[in-house]
Regions:
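Short, small-residue-biased leader/transition segments that mark boundaries at the very start
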Residues: 1-14
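Short acidic, Pro/Gly- and aromatic-enriched capping/linker segments at domain boundaries
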Residues: 15-35, 46, 248-249
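Short Pro-Gly-centered flexible turn/kink motifs
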Residues: 34-38, 99, 250-267
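Extended, loop-rich substrate-binding clefts of extracytoplasmic carbohydrate-active enzymes
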Residues: 39-92
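Acidic/His-leaning functional-site neighborhoods
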Residues: 46-58, 163-247
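Acidic, contiguous internal or C-terminal segments within carbohydrate-active enzymes
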Residues: 70-124
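Beta-strand-rich interaction surfaces with strong enrichment in secreted/lumenal proteins
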Residues: 85-87, 247-252
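Active-site/ligand-binding surface loops and adjacent short beta/alpha elements
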Residues: 108-110, 121, 125-206
């Protein structure tokens, strides 16, 4: 199997973007608005970076870095100067994705960042309910999660996912709840298995949250699942506090940088 047979590209995209970077927010702010120092701003789901053109600023045979800088348009909806870099490095059967956020302003920078890669189900038969499995680790018996409720935001209630030998079966109706958001650093690796429980792709990450999502509640025969490392998440229903006080926010002092990464591993390629 080649990389293109595992990672979903634009040809299978249901929305206008595929594998987008989520910045400067992950998910939604309540009513698509937020407050910062007495001003109210509007931001759509997952922020604006995924809709903007990045500049190629570094390139070699197996690596590249793309850069996005704040400008007049971003400052209208997000009043923070920044430089966002996304790096990619191919090493054997591993794709490393690296993020760098730099605060180029003279005041604290508040942000969230996340990934949204999508992966094909292997040997999908749309006429059946079976899709495959997610392996969270054989020692994990239960996981706590939250899911979107009103207007794409969450309620405080937590739910428990019970696993059998660390496995979550993926079926046509698995994502009736929309998204499983696992927080509090419960997971550091997720492996996607085929219907015979053979592993073919893994994600390794250090993010405090990771989400699992597929739009199968709306599109029952969609052929992919998303595994999404997040440094942040959507608002709680009804939140109207300050932007900087949202849950799971990241903060940078002037001149400081935030760096993080995750890896995609093709398990049956050496």
């Amino acid at each position: 199997y080649e990389i293109s047979e595992c990672l979903v590209g634009s040809e299978m995209c249901i929305r206008d973007s595929h594998s987008p970077v989520l910045f400067p927010i992950v998910g939604r702010v309540w009513n698509n608005t937020y407050r910062h120092k007495g001003q109210t701003y509007s931001l759509e789901q997952h922020g604006f970076a995924r809709d903007m053109d990045f500049q190629l600023t570094y390139e070699e045979e197996n690596a590249a870095i793309y850069t996005l800088e704040s400008n007049e348009e971003t400052m209208k909806v997000y009043p923070f100067p920044f430089v966002l870099e996304i790096g990619y490095r191919l090493k054997g059967n591993r794709i490393e994705v690296m993020w760098s956020v730099q605060n180029t302003g003279d005041k604290d920078l508040h942000f969230q960042i996340g990934a949204h890669p999508a992966f094909y189900y292997r040997d999908l038969n749309p006429e059946t309910n079976e899709r495959g499995f997610l392996d969270f680790g054989k020692k994990i018996k239960t996981l706590e999660y939250i899911s979107p409720a009103e207007k794409g935001c969450v309620l405080p209630q937590r739910h428990t996912l019970t696993l059998h030998e660390g496995l979550m079966e993926l079926r046509r109706d698995t994502f009736a709840c929309d998204t499983y958001m696992f927080d509090n650093s419960q997971l550091k690796k997720i492996t996607l298995l085929d219907k015979k429980q053979q592993p073919y792709i893994s994600l390794e990450f250090n993010s405090p949250l990771v989400a699992v999502w597929s739009p199968s509640a709306t599109y029952p025969n969609v052929p992919f699942v998303c595994i999404e490392p997040w440094y942040g998440r959507c608002d709680t229903v009804g939140y109207e506090g300050e932007f900087k006080d949202r849950e799971w926010m990241q903060h940078l002092a002037p001149g400081k940088s935030f760096e993080a990464s995750y890896s995609i591993i093709l398990e049956d390629i050496e």
